[in-house]
């Protein structure tokens, strides 16, 4: 995993702010037209819905994820790992420590 994600991007200045500021991100479009978000999650439990499929890379931190339809089968992810979520779905996430992430909308 490289610290440099993209050299040429279109970045939106306005932040996406969720859960009273406990989750924030900024969207950008890379040089190939792919939309991504770089964000930070503070410790807590959150539920997100998806419209498009998502590839969620955990850059640093630790989370547990419960995918829609998986009952109580929480999966753990740490910095350097990723998970994918299908379109028109949802997932619950427990953030155990401050977590940096990069979400790619597929």
Q: What are the language-model segments listed below?
A:
Residues 1-34:
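A short, N-terminal "cap"/entry segment at the start of jelly-roll beta-barrel domains
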Residues 86-106:
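Ligand-binding loop in jelly-roll beta-barrel domains
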Residues 50-65:
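Short, conserved beta-strand element in jelly-roll/cupin
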Residues 70-88:
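Short acidic-glycine-tyrosine-enriched beta hairpin
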Residues 32-41, 101:
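Small beta-barrel nucleic-acid-binding modules, principally OB-folds
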Residues 41-43, 86:
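Surface-exposed, low-hydrophobicity beta-strand/loop segments enriched in small/polar/acidic residues
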Residues 19, 46-48:
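Short loop/turn motifs at secondary-structure junctions and domain boundaries
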